[in-house]
Amino acid sequence: MAGFVGRFEHSVDSKGRVILPVRFREAFLRGGFLTPNQEGCVALRTPGENERQMAEMLEAAKSSSAGRNQARVWAANTAEVEIDKQGRMAIPSHLRDFAHLEGDVLIHGAIDRIELWNPSQWEERVKPMEAWFLEGDE
């Protein structure tokens, strides 16, 4: 897999839908899974990547109550989505509320998944990391 890379800006429409960038659509011909991400964004995973993530959650759930709680919250808030012929996907209201997705949305590749961010939260949480990355770690 080449992975998901690139950064795009789109908007959530009045029906809670967002257009998936063309370069990402082929990976989601069979649909995808939207999940809450611990950083405050929403992740879009392919069916195969979602299965891998579920297996990780299941293993964590077997070993601790914290793992069970994390798996429980993750599974309860995951939504299966379809991409329509116009390249749009509906984001369930609980995930839009979780990530504050209204109006403009930043969509970017994160190698094994796609992330959807509120642009203000992206600036607050990720922009400082971009500066660190560009400076190097020395």
Predicted regions and their residues:
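Flexible "stalk/tail and boundary" regions
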Residues: M1-H10, S14-K15, R23-V81, K85-Q86, ...
